[in-house]
């Protein structure tokens, strides 16, 4: 029977089932329900909530609770959840009365399915092994404490969330848990962070039918999505209770929006970090690095970030808080100032000289510490309680920031390892902390940098868990820049993680340029030499030219890329968009992996000379060929000076910028708009100051562009800018490049005919609109 409420902004309704289980239901907002189930009278604490990873400041939701015999219901207007107090069966329907979830049931360990799934899990993952790497990385063997001897844990302490599936329903997300598919119905996904297997699992999936589930636990769990029973989705938890969120919307983008609302909106890197981030060889000293910087500028290959691998440290792989520079190879300061504080940037030494050339410096780090100390001290401080007196590991890095370092590469060593012998300060074991550590590491990095500098920095980490997207960027780890990395990008994007990348060009020689093509169209781009030499000036002439051309293309697209990043921070939409996210009604793309949409306008082919073009008109970005597709796969050989296929969607409006050697944070004075007229289309360009956190409180400018093609007339409109940010230009020049394939007869600016335009051999019309005021509505009419 209905028992009562837990008092908060939106109450947790408590229901006691006839089978002895206690259920809690909270309507977080209209479209999000949080559900807890336990065999006890009290619910266990969520560490994700305790440490500020999950949203708790929900606004009050209008809701109505009803009881009808054994049926308990809670309605929020758009959705209603019903629980049968006799059986525990839960169902959800929308306002129209359509059932979205027909049967969701919590199964205790007494149910035979727990033992069945445990056996399947243990058999499936029996051969999973992490190679030890000379003591640098590799899971501990459990010598010092109890370690699960089976993947499933103890079946007698397990439980299952069991959901009946609908015919034709497809599932996406799960983080980097599958490197065979992006559509996961029929798969089992392992939610446990493991080096070179599942670095960023996210216990979240969304259905093609407009709903999603986030399993709010940090313990090992498994998503059996129709693998054991094709009509049932079972979440196997290695504990006897559950805490999960159900989210609903009209589409998968709606579900991503709600999921990232719960677990944190995606972090936006500083604008310059969306340029080329390059890691030189780990044997290079400061003079080699400075020479690299000079050659990047001389060879006109744009680059913004250089980082140092472990060679910068006095002690190689120094995990301590006492680390120092290797002053024999690097001079960020005079060596005799090594023990003098506070630290500062010397403009005439290594870091300052890089800054003078427009480069930002990052440092490689390895970490192994107890992150619960910092978190518990933060809680104690808020409550006015004493501190632990123990060191906060991240604090020692402020000295390097003061010297001019602007970010850190967080190596998987050894946070990604299991630490079954650890006695965590908060009293938890590694069973609760291992997955959580992967969020707390970038969280504490971001919080330290924000507090110390007030600016966004470049930092990224190989591993993660739900919520990691809010605290920084990621790479696919030590898995190269090939197909494994491609699966990670697609699956992470479908899990609300926007800032993803990989070790671009870390592939076999014959795929290296194809990997560069891939990397150019990633949210952020890193090329990691490590033991190699990936500098563009070490390649042959043909490859140098391809390298340069791709980097120049990348930099020209920075307004488009950065706009997509800000959009992602507001909505949860990734920059790399798997095809089913953009074309959900096209069954041909359900599990498509050799291509994706880059933002809303580019279709990028990866490691293949075949590409599927959904229904519509597409333009070959390299040749200008226009293809009217009925939804079909085509084969094309890309030009000799390119390394992959690239198509532009009908109606596209793409903001670009003139050639630059580095980005900085200053907004572009001139925006080049590449326009592909087709019917009615539009595009909103988002901008901010490029480095502060003001975007989080709305300091974003939005410029809406609209194009209308009607017969022989194309009408293009630049609307007044909405919103503002520090440093926003009051006026701007727009260069229009209209790709209609026909020579205009007349062009009008407002009602005035203009003659200062050109029509080139590439069948593109170009005109310049100078000094356009941000408050003006500007309209160009082209007649053919």
Language model regions located:
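Bacterial Sec-dependent N-terminal signal peptides
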Residues: 1-12
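Aromatic- and carboxylate-enriched substrate-binding clefts and catalytic-loop regions
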Residues: 47-52, 302-551, 580-584, 592, ...
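Short, well-ordered beta-strand segments enriched in hydrophobic/aromatic residues
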Residues: 23-25, 35-37, 73-74, 78, ...
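Catalytic core of carbohydrate-active enzymes
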Residues: 447-457, 466-475, 494-498, 502, ...
